[in-house]
Amino acid sequence: IWQDWRWRVQRDGWRAAWPHIRKEALTLPYRRIKFVVVARSLAQSLPDARARASITVRPFAAGDLDFVRREYLPSEAHLCAQRLARGHNGIAACIAGQIVGYAWSCTDASLERVDLRFEPGDVLFTDAFTAPSARGQGVQTTLSEARLRAAQEQRHQRILAYIEVNNAPSLAVWRKKMNAEV
């Protein structure tokens, strides 16, 4: 967290960064992030992929870590680098050749250090992010559809995802567009 605070000060200046740092520092001892687990059988038909010609999907690459550092947080870039090294499957969404979002999946919950009951054929959909400038354009829906298709092609039977309870946009994508159960 210190690295993230230093980054905020360098990026935004002390005055702009201080309210964020103060809020995080005050809530840090009491932080209890709650997640919900979302499940979806891959035996169900996949959602209709609406043509989003402006969004392309490709594998996440080491060069994409600069985007994560710039748009999100340095600690998230470090986590993404660890995921690449551990063999997670990462994908990136691009508009006009520029990365605007990413998402991860893996077949071993211990790689993500979460306590989920995995069965043979399960795949875990983990972290996903969309740049603020691209939100509301269908980036996460496109990434989620791409992950579902890849999981189905790899003959997985079920996907699991854990999502923060306060992440309404992500929960809406999974409930409404991906037909997942919470």
Predicted features and spans:
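Short, surface-exposed acidic/glycine-rich loop or hinge patches that mediate macromolecular interfaces
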Residues: 62, 133, 164-165
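Conserved GNAT acetyl-CoA-binding A-motif
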Residues: 151-163
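A conserved beta-strand-loop-helix scaffold within acyl/acetyltransferase catalytic domains
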Residues: 72-132, 145
